[in-house]
């Protein structure tokens, strides 16, 4: 029993440190800190991702996702290609379906796996729009998502534990969306 309690405390301490690091890094990352090469590459990734979404616009899953997203909202976000306005989460969902459907989006191969990190852009676009942000905010939040997705899988071999590396995608989406919304360190944590 004492061992289980120590293990629980160790996990809680580790999670607290990770949360503290991610929230601190998220609020400290500024567009002005990004090298021009990173900004240019991120612009290309965002444009490519929007192209993937538009290419999948007429697919059956995309139509279903847009139909599911027909919900009015006081602070709406836009579904790519349609002008449809809905809740930020449903816009991110519908956009994410379109971004991912054709499987033409980017891929990363890391030490312990990989993933399609441009999937995370759906989680960035809606909050940037809702807070009336612009390209700089979208680029900064996208870079943040990519950094989480590229670096975390190289530190932990989730595949050996039968976990998919997209677990990090969920974390990256949450932190990047929080950055895009302009949340404080405390609100992110």
Label every PLM stretch briefly.
Residues 1-14:
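Short, Lys/Arg-enriched N-terminal segments with co-localized hydrophobic residues
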Residues 15-189:
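N-terminal core-entry segment
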């Amino acid at each position: 029993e004492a061992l289980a309690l120590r293990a629980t405390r160790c996990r809680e301490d580790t999670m607290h440190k990770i949360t503290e690091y991610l929230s601190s890094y998220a609020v400290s990352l500024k567009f002005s800190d990004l090298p021009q090469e990173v900004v240019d590459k991120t612009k290309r990734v965002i444009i490519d991702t929007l192209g993937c979404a538009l290419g999948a616009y007429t697919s059956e899953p995309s139509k279903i996702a847009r139909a599911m997203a027909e919900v009015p909202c006081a602070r709406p976000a836009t579904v790519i290609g349609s002008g449809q306005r809905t809740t930020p989460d449903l816009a991110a969902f519908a956009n994410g379906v379109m971004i991912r459907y054709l499987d033409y989006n980017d891929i990363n191969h890391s030490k312990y796996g990989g993933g399609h990190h441009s999937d995370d852009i759906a989680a960035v676009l809606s909050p940037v729009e809702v807070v009336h942000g612009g390209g700089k905010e979208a680029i900064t939040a996208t870079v943040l998502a990519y950094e989480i997705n590229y670096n975390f899988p190289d530190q932990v071999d989730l595949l050996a534990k039968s976990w998919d590396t997209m677990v990090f995608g969920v974390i990256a989406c949450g932190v990047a969306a929080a950055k895009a919304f302009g949340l404080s360190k405390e609100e992110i944590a």
